[in-house]
A protein has these predicted regions:
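A basic, often C-terminal nucleic-acid-binding module that engages the phosphate backbone, implemented
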Residues: 28-30, 141-171
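Catalytic DNA-binding helix-loop module of base-excision-repair DNA glycosylases/AP lyases
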Residues: 88-140
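Structural motif
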Residues: 11-24, 52-59, 163-170
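Short, hydrophobic/amphipathic alpha-helical patches that form generic packing surfaces
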Residues: 22-34, 63-68, 114, 170-171
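Alpha-helical ds-nucleic-acid-binding substructure associated with the helix-hairpin-helix region
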Residues: 33-102
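Short, charged/polar micro-motifs that form catalytic or ligand-binding hotspots
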Residues: 11-15, 19, 28-31, 53, ...
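Short amphipathic alpha-helical segments and their helix-coil junctions
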Residues: 1-16, 43-50, 90-95, 160
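Short acidic alpha-helix initiation/capping motifs at coil-to-helix transition points
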Residues: 17-21, 87-90, 152-155
């Protein structure tokens, strides 16, 4: 069942900037929310835009970012997906694109890679607990100011991708 839905979402997300924006918004709305509420929240945002009740806190900033950058993000993602890069290189490139989105941390950026390209996956708090992993390993420096800080973030992203691959969260 998962593979059927994942591939359908990937095809949908790859069709247009608006579709990819909708999938990204769905991903952000799912943060700290029961999955069953997401459909209603998506409807709320489609109807009420910035005044939607579902857009609280950082989610409003994410919506603004997506509306302003969806075409650029879509072009970048599709360029990576359609490239001749290895899956590992595609995963890293996609993670870097999605980590630029306001409100997406490592887990949700990985989820977006999964929902758009079948790569990486979502090691959220539930999976971290289930697999007995250390959550600190998945937290990036917000604004690394040094080469050492940047290198540490790249290392954490690579480690995250590898863990997702090892635990089989990709298609």
């Amino acid at each position: 069942m998962y593979i059927q839905h994942a591939v359908a979402v990937q095809k949908y997300a790859q069709q247009s900037a608006d579709n990819m924006c909708a999938v990204t918004l769905m991903t952000v709305l799912s943060i700290r929310q029961p999955w069953l509420n997401i459909g209603e929240q998506m409807k709320d945002v489609r109807t009420n835009k910035l005044q939607a009740k579902a857009l609280w806190g950082f989610k409003k900033d994410t919506y603004i970012y997506l509306e302003s950058n969806k075409h650029k993000m879509y072009a970048q993602v599709m360029a990576v997906i359609n490239s001749n890069k290895t899956d590992a290189s595609k995963a890293m490139s996609l993670m870097k694109i999605f980590l630029r989105v306001d409100g997406l941390g490592m887990a949700k950026a990985g989820f977006m890679c999964q929902l758009t390209a079948g790569l990486v996956g979502c090691m959220d708090s539930h999976n971290i607990k289930m697999y007995n992993l250390d959550a600190k390993d998945f937290v990036l420096a917000k604004n690394p100011k040094t080469i050492k800080g940047l290198d540490a973030n790249v290392k954490k992203i690579r480690n995250y991708i590898q863990i997702c691959h090892e635990y089989g969260t990709e298609n």
